[in-house]
Amino acid sequence: MSGTKLEDSPPCRNWSSASELNETQEPFLNPTDYDDEEFLRYLWREYLHPKEYEWVLIAGYIIVFVVALIGNVLVCVAVWKNHHMRTVTNYFIVNLSLADVLVTITCLPATLVVDITETWFFGQSLCKVIPYLQTVSVSVSVLTLSCIALDRWYAICHPLMFKSTAKRARNSIVIIWIVSCIIMIPQAIVMECSTVFPGLANKTTLFTVCDERWGGEIYPKMYHICFFLVTYMAPLCLMVLAYLQIFRKLWCRQIPGTSSVVQRKWKPLQPVSQPRGPGQPTKSRMSAVAAEIKQIRARRKTARMLMIVLLVFAICYLPISILNVLKRVFGMFAHTEDRETVYAWFTFSHWLVYANSAANPIIYNFLSGKFREEFKAAFSCCCLGVHHRQEDRLTRGRTSTESRKSLTTQISNFDNISKLSEQVVLTSISTLPAANGAGPLQNW
């Protein structure tokens, strides 16, 4: 928006404060200089009506909303419909998709509205609920990614220490949601609605903001430092360490029955196929080596996909995490003159957070053959369903037309047969031989 940005962050994550506007607003943004109607018209023209570049932002949010919603729902349906896809890793992926669906439905629309209109239109209750759900979904996503990394680390690096099962995965998912709901309760407690212009509170809801209200200056700093460490930095460091060990295990290891160490190069692994001589592996040993190579290939694909998911998550959440710490902890952007740039940074970082929810299904589609097949099957069913409905209409139309034509033909044939029958009867009567020279009618 042109002019001063009333709230640099969306309500869901509450990444900036609107209370500082009174210190930085432009001189002409003073309601006492105008009558109420004129001032409200000015607000609509300068702040509420989307500018040209904000239409691009709206289009970007719509694309993310559609892709994130459809993609993550398809992920859940694919695992639910196919028993062979109900693995430990896929259970966690479904949980990640559920968190993405939650944040897409509940928080994305509110974020877009506030970023464009600079106003919280949704009341006091949703001012507490929506930010709470946002932080819960962030916590669920981070803890789920951490559980995936931990599960892969145990399965690949220490397979004998811990055995993952579907039941344990489901129990872990329940614990993740319970822990996330508990630790994010402070976010719901501190959120409050307020208005920038109290004199207009009875006339309009414009410039009502949903922001944190703390009892002192030290508490928000402590909270946001802990939030940054718990939901971003600490889990990210642990996951990076886990995947580094997984990488070393899968790409730099000695395969029994092969002649050399598997290098970091991503070359396809081939079992030894020379003729067996003294000391050469037996056929059963070769089969075991081939099975192990096949398992390593599958684990490489899975690890590669999960590493990319983690990398995309880190990139998408990095800008808003840094901006949040700079603003909440160090008090930056409170007296900046270039608020348009600050607004652009915050707005883009908000969009990146939601784009992460849309990116995950795309990653699964490109890097997982099973998910790709299920996505294709789902779209094929939709397309075939439309095609079948069109064919049914055409078939019914053809059947109706053919029925009418058949009925007309039958009636026409019946008339022709009737006429032919009459002609045959009359002809047969007229050609009877005359008796005693009498005419044909004399026999009656």
Swiss-Prot record:
User: InterPro entries this protein is in?
Assistant: GPCR_Rhodpsn (IPR000276), GPCR_Rhodpsn_7TM (IPR017452), Orexin_rcpt (IPR000204), Orexin_rcpt_2 (IPR004060)
Cellular component aspect of the GO annotation = nucleoplasm; plasma membrane; synapse
Using the chain's own numbering, where are the disulfide bonds?
Answer: 127-210
Which organism encodes this protein? Homo sapiens (Human)
Q: What is the lineage of its organism?
A: Eukaryota, Metazoa, Chordata, Craniata, Vertebrata
The signal peptide, as residue positions, is none
Keyword Nucleotide-binding applies = no
Give the comment on domains: The N-terminal region is required for orexin signaling.
Q: Positions of the site: Important for responses to orexin?
A: 44
Stretch list, region Disordered: 1-20
| The entry's keywords | Cell membrane, Disulfide bond, G-protein coupled receptor, Glycoprotein, Membrane, Receptor, Transducer, Transmembrane, Transmembrane helix
Q: Tell me the Pfam families matching this sequence.
A: 7tm_1, Orexin_rec2
Q: What role is this protein assigned? A: Nonselective, high-affinity receptor for both orexin-A and orexin-B neuropeptides. Triggers an increase in cytoplasmic Ca(2+) levels in response to orexin-A binding.
Topology versus the membrane, per the UniProt entry? Answer: Multi-pass membrane protein
- State a single Gene Ontology molecular function: neuropeptide receptor activity
PANTHER family found in the cross-reference section: G PROTEIN-COUPLED RECEPTOR 15-LIKE, LEUCOKININ RECEPTOR-RELATED
Q: State the similarity comment.
A: Belongs to the G-protein coupled receptor 1 family.
Query: Where are its TM segments located?
Result: 55-75, 89-110, 128-150, 171-191, 223-243, 305-326, 343-366
Q: What is this protein called?
A: Orexin receptor type 2
Residues with glycosylation annotation: 14, 22, 202
Binding-site residues for suvorexant, renumbered to this chain: 324
Instruction: Give the region (Required for response to orexin-A) as residue ranges.
Output: 33-49
